[in-house]
């Protein structure tokens, strides 16, 4: 049986647990497992809650170089938000939240942060575009079937003021001084326009036929998987403008936790399957 190798963030994590609804049963199969069943493949799900794109790329690379190439049926990169930072330390994982054991090195763990990444949004986007190209080059070097896509919008949420976590929001419902979002400080006259220019500039270096939803930006005619599966079409230029996300409630865990529930994961798996 061939292997389906996938990495991503909490929307992919097979062990996902809701931080704001801890009693919610999240033991249902996630979209990679559902997709693997459709493809009659063994699922190698490397997804981790809170993961950024360094983790996603690095775990895919490590899995690819250590797996006999004739055993690989398909590789999927499910990219996340650009503001996230991933790093490794030589340390044991004692069950801490957002710390994940390195699959191939028991002395190392992965950690991640949502805020405080070095650089700015323009660098982060260029960094992501380089991951797109590097992942594609790695797969083509070994003649491996692959697809890549943004599970989440890469930068709109950050430009509009990154939302606090669902855990923080739920635990501050009675706090009138609580700010739901971090404030974004613009660096140009139109940061959004400058961000839009970057994927357009790099497009000639990317095999867009193998990129589901390219260029992954709604205003440029692309999309993130979350937007096309878990949200309605009640949007203007971006689903992330303001607080109006327009989630389909039947497909998410709760009013505060926007992660897909069992039906949401089923829809994501079907959406991706139809585009392979």
Range-by-range predicted roles:
Residues 1-57, 61, 66-67:
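Serine-esterase "nucleophile elbow" of acetyl-processing enzymes
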């Amino acid at each position: 049986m061939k292997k389906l190798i996938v990495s991503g963030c909490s929307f992919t994590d097979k062990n996902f647990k809701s931080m704001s609804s801890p009693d919610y049963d999240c033991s249902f199969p996630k979209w990679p497992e559902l997709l693997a069943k459709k493809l009659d493949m063994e699922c190698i799900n490397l997804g981790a809650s809170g993961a950024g794109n360094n983790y996603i790329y690095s775990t895919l690379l490590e899995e690819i170089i250590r797996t006999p190439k004739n055993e690989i049926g398909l590789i999927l990169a499910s990219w996340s938000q650009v503001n996230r930072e991933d790093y490794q330390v030589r340390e044991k994982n004692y069950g801490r939240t957002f710390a994940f054991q390195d699959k191939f090195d028991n002395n190392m763990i992965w950690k991640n942060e949502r805020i405080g990444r070095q650089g700015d949004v323009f660098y982060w986007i260029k960094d992501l575009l380089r991951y797109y190209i590097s992942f594609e080059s790695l797969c083509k070097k070994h003649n491996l079937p692959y697809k890549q896509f943004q599970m989440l919008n890469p930068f709109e949420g950050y430009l509009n003021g990154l939302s606090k976590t669902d855990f923080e929001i739920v635990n501050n419902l009675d706090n009138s001084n609580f700010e739901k979002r971090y404030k974004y400080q613009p660096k140009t006259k139109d940061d959004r326009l400058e961000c839009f220019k970057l994927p357009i500039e790099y497009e000639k270096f990317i095999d867009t036929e193998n990129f589901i939803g390219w260029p992954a930006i709604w205003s440029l005619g692309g999309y993130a998987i979350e937007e096309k599966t878990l949200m309605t079409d009640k949007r203007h230029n971006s689903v992330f403008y303001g607080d109006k996300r327009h989630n389909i409630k039947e497909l998410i865990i709760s009013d505060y936790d926007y992660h897909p529930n069992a039906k949401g994961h089923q829809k994501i798996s079907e959406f991706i399957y139809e585009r392979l």
